[in-house]
Amino acid sequence: VAREDQNLPAIPLEPADGLVMLRSTPGGANVTVDGTFRGQTPIELTLAPGRNHNVVFFLNGYQEASRAVRTSAADESTVAVALEPITSSVRISATPADAELYINGQLRGRADQQIELLAASQTIEIRKDGYVPFSTTFISRPGLAQQLVVSLKTLEQQRQENIKTEIAAT
């Protein structure tokens, strides 16, 4: 009724979630919170306050990292992790020896070398002017002795191989 005092029951309020900014180096790491996938870094998430959350960062070729995160109501925080790469040594032998090695499109020097590669799928290219380039997808495996042996063909060799042989009967 208008203009009359009324007694209403108390309305319980729930504490606001905490806001957490998650970052990783390198970026693009997958993130799970308490076992549930939540996205990729960098990502901003709200987490229930007053309890510990298990945040796990994982990215192909890197060691998994986990952090215990506890938020307070309406609190803002940042969690940043540097993921440790998992690498493997690979021996690359190339002919001609002065051909160039590219890993994922980046020049890494002469092709004939021992190199540390991330234990993830990588594109390896070996190039030299006047030769047919070589390209392959390669996954290095830690703990295994691995070698990639490549002999580039000259453009003339490739042209000769592409000529179809015709045999004429007379």
Mark where each language-model region is.
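Short loop/turn and low-complexity linker motifs enriched in small/turn-promoting residues
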Residues: 1-170
